[in-house]
């Protein structure tokens, strides 16, 4: 990853785009597919890089920024449930200084002179849920989903042992939130059953819990050893108690399971002592935890702190360091991705780390192999932070055998045997054979049908591989003629292994449904290198319609200077990305494929809708000392209402809020005839927005 302090604005723009796409994909895999692609530590590193870039270049923050979102868009097979209060994720603290900063932010934000009591509890590595009771009867159970809309899993939650279906002496409307999990020993037993039945084993306890909850048949869920803890009252918690410790006492009285391992800390020292206690004893707990959650105990103070886009300000998660293990590197295999990028993968002697068996680890790029001096048959150190794919930290050189083998970086593609192209600035090796490379073609079709592209349900990895192997499809266009081909064939798809009449009917129905697609989704589905969802939206906004888009791309092939300049001027499309677009449309087969797709698809023109309020997009400046609220609280409220808070006054400023001892900014605002109000007027204004 590049040094944030030295990065240029253009480089930052490109990196933010890449991070948005990567993190969105990782979120979808984690929250929706229950199949994490990277470790917690690697995800956190990417997310923190994104935050640092946004702090340095706030004007480059994307509409689809990971810092604005929680989780991932929900799938279609469950009914949707809208959370009255969003189920947001927590910010992370990785060391004691991060925790001290968290405590200091609370003091500064709330203008406190003393330490405000902090409630500490284990961070269970499970699946978040919400349960709603009306007149004491359980009516709705839901997953977190994207934080705003989850999936209805009421029938499945009711199968969990000791989960109350009816409770007494509670308000007419009650919500509880918590974590559903599977204990370590139960997980091992479950995987043993899966293996005996010839089924795939679960990667870890969290995946097993998530997969169990997302069963359409609740009788399957009932057979899984699910357990739960509640830790929040959601929209109704402040009707039950005035603090977190009181709330848990009340929920326990109602019959809910709460985690008895908790601590109400009255100092930083008590916080750190509890953290060390849990870190030392985590392996002795029956369930997996990956850190400690700290939250302001007082609900009134929580209300004042409020939220940022995806996190509450009043809480944070102090993560445990990753678990380290050692095993043998058996071999290095190479995967070819959608855009031709080759990625080395370490094949390992299976090792159990934190209750999970690990046999593979990504090596990211070929330079990492050389930098770490990795050799086949070496003993390597693995780092795992609660997920599936660990990271190789280095080699145990003291145990290096005499017969180790160095890995030779390939010169030719392992899929199509074409000569590989090496780009030092990207630290990658790429196959430029495009659709003629079977591996790239497979990944391109997988991308085309994926959730955020054409969204063709029923065409997963195995199904795409099967259809390609049988010669039924060879490019994205073939998908839309699959039914026609099947109808005229003697060898029907529904009679083949892994298929049935119902699954084939559903597939054809979903293919037909996908023919109505928005222009941004269509452009994203094409799989142009570095054109993620955000850049696809930029192009769609610029060209408006499919016909204009394809016409302009054909002009680009003729080196038309106007279209080149138009693209180059787009915010978010730098020189490097422009080269990728040109390279894609320089391939005649790509243009022909897109035209044929355009003939059979209904590609909707681009439309942009935004909710408006009186402060949306207004530029507000705060100056001087505000009598009753902190500057941070005022800024947070303004941003929550859609305003942009600037540090300096200019002709673009819409409003200046002036406190005591306002200086040069107030003077400049008067000179520019900008509207000026005091704190009292500001509080009245935001109350009426």
Swiss-Prot record:
Catalytic activity of the protein: NAD(+) + (deoxyribonucleotide)n-3'-hydroxyl + 5'-phospho-(deoxyribonucleotide)m = (deoxyribonucleotide)n+m + AMP + beta-nicotinamide D-nucleotide
Active site: 123
Protein family: Belongs to the NAD-dependent DNA ligase family. LigA subfamily.
Gene3D superfamilies to which the protein is assigned, alphabetical: 5' to 3' exonuclease, C-terminal subdomain (1.10.150.20), BRCT domain (3.40.50.10190), DNA ligase/mRNA capping enzyme (3.30.470.30), Helix hairpin bin (1.10.287.610), Nucleic acid-binding proteins (2.40.50.140)
InterPro entries tied to this protein: BRCT_dom, BRCT_dom_sf, DisA/LigA_HHH, DNA_ligase, DNA_ligase_AS, DNA_ligase_CS, DNAligase_adenylation, DNAligase_N
EC number(s) reported in the record: 6.5.1.2
Necessary cofactors: Mg(2+); Mn(2+)
Lineage: Bacteria, Pseudomonadati, Pseudomonadota, Alphaproteobacteria, Rickettsiales
One example GO MF annotation: metal ion binding
Protein name per its UniProtKB record: DNA ligase
Tagged with keyword Oxidoreductase: no
Top-level lineage group: Bacteria
One GO term of the biological process aspect: DNA repair
Sites where the protein binds Zn(2+): 413, 416, 431, 437
Alphabetically ordered keywords of this record: DNA damage, DNA repair, DNA replication, Ligase, Magnesium, Manganese, Metal-binding, NAD, Zinc
Signal peptide span: none
The protein's role, per its UniProt record: DNA ligase that catalyzes the formation of phosphodiester linkages between 5'-phosphoryl and 3'-hydroxyl groups in double-stranded DNA using NAD as a coenzyme and as the energy source for the reaction. It is essential for DNA replication and repair of damaged DNA.
Any single Gene Ontology cellular-component annotation: cytosol
Domain BRCT: residue ranges: 610-689
Listed PROSITE patterns: BRCT (PS50172), DNA_LIGASE_N1 (PS01055), DNA_LIGASE_N2 (PS01056)
Record flagged with keyword Membrane: no
Binding site for NAD(+): 40-44, 89-90, 121, 144, 179, 295, 319
Pfam families linked: BRCT, DNA_ligase_aden, DNA_ligase_OB, HHH_2
